[in-house]
Amino acid sequence: GANWDDFVAFTVELGLEGVEGLSGIPGTVGASVVQNIGAYGQEVATSVESVEVWDRDTKTTRDLTPADLRFGYRYSALKTSMYAGPGRPAGRFFPTPRYVVLSVTFALTHSAEGTVGYGQLAKALGVEVGDRMATADIRKAVLAVRAAKGMLEDPTRYALPDMATAKREANILTDLERLASLNEAAGIPVGDDGLPAPDYNRHSCGSFFMNPILTADQAAALPEDAPKFDATLPD
């Protein structure tokens, strides 16, 4: 499938708002809707209009709406189709979903500005949560924050045979130059060619942790300064 960050970069170049906060996440557009990826105040679910899939059970194509997909916190109906029940793999399709994602239709806003929706990102930009900023600046800040935490994908991995054609060549070069600049600013040496050395700790397929989900009573028992976020759970 299409490289996710290639897609995000393309939307920012076109002056579209909606997924700029999801910059730098490894993986594909198809996988993004299976996991309902989210970061820095945005989730894929808020921008998806429909998903075209191949149903491996009925051998037909289907167009799934957000209601069909039942998006939740790192959750979708596509993801749960791998299971016959809680903790019970569906023998026929596991460890892959019943549905193969063929295409995703996004509904984005024609705007060169986006909303800063996360505290850490707002701090990096020197603004308040809820402020409007250029989507290009939001993307740049997200990538810098990820790099500082060691969570920015190593673009040198695309030189490996198994990764060939997985990302646009022009974007690989842009990513290499960006990471070299960020490394240099952080005092991390770059190669004689001015590009970053391979960092195998950044050969990532993304993070799979989830924040704990608590009842309102359980959350009330936490210290007052413990971060808390409302969660929308699937039925």
What do the PLM-derived regions correspond to, one by one?
Residues T61-D235:
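Phosphate/pyrophosphate- and phosphate-bearing ligand-binding catalytic cores of soluble enzymes
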Residues G1-T58, R62, D68:
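Anion-binding (especially nucleotide phosphate/pyrophosphate-binding) glycine-rich loop
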